[in-house]
Amino acid sequence: MNTFLFLTAFLTFVEFNCENLFDFRHDSLKNDIEFTPEGDRKWTERKYWNKLNNISKAIISCGIDGKDWHLPDLVALCEVENDSVMRDLTKRSLLRNANYEYLVTNSPDERGIDVALIYDPMHFQPIRHYPLRIKPMEGMRPTRDILYVAGRIITDDTLHIFVVHAPSRYGGEKPTRPHRMLIAKTLCGAIDSIRLASSDPNIIIAGDFNDYADSKALMQLQLHGMKNASHDAKGSNGAKATYKYKGEWNSIDHIMVSQRLYGMKVFGRINDQTFMLEPDEKYGGVQPYRTYRAWRYRNGYSDHLPLVVRFALKQPD
């Protein structure tokens, strides 16, 4: 009789909407003039580097786990402008010694907003990656690509990752609902393709869905066997969700995982370190500490808070 000793390795996954992580240079092909020195935000090189280091600090703090600390293994980011921003974030900011690598989309979004995946190559080795382009339906503006990445994790299993930033509710929730359903339909098709090749795959879908856990789009993913690993996530310093609007906490950011990974979940939480919060003077309690309040520069972090989910992976010794 053969006896195997299984060791536990942990994988920490973070999702974070950075809120307008733009560089300070104008892209003539995009509507990004607002975030330039001449634009309405007076977005200078100094403000840009402040923002990069603030986002870095937020990511680093996601690794705090009680008395222990470790850098996240994978970080899904929304609202990053381009490859140049990601290079500065991973190679020149406070993250420069973390040895992170990254993958980023180049979407047709009119403002130039993209999604990206940061990864520790010691714990995740990409095998293939490509964008899933969303063909706009009638009345829908060009939107962000979905980033798909498949890679090897420490157990030598394949992990499939989708990074999503779904169309917003601007113009009303009901009129824009089909836009987000289109994202869900695209993801369900991709999941089906993966399952044709693997009966029990490891899948993570993470990002800003601009929808709640009980929305039709999220329910469609659940009907396709995905579980919401962040449904019970709470902060420890007053955050009840990742996003606060007019005094109401709501989670529009989600980390959805396949059944197999859901069984490996250790915890899901909101990273609401006190330095990422400020008093909510109008509605009470606290709120995310943003880069701007209206048009006033605050040198904050984001209007979203990061989600953190940790998994325990079994590997044979």
Language-model segment annotations:
Residues 74, 80-166:
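Structured beta-strand-rich core segments of catalytic domains in phosphoester-bond hydrolases
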Residues 16-19, 78-80, 104-108, 120-121, ...:
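Active-site-proximal beta-strand/loop segments in catalytic clefts of secreted hydrolases
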Residues 189-203, 210-317:
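Metal-dependent phosphoester-hydrolase catalytic domains
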Residues 29-32, 157, 162-176:
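Active-site His/acidic residue clusters
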Residues 37-48, 71-77, 104-105, 135-137, ...:
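Second-shell loop/turn segments in exported
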Residues 82-84, 110-112, 169-171, 210-216, ...:
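Active-site environment of divalent metal-dependent phosphoester hydrolases
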Residues 9-95, 103-115, 185, 282-285, ...:
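N-terminal, active-site-proximal structural segment of metallo-dependent hydrolase catalytic domains
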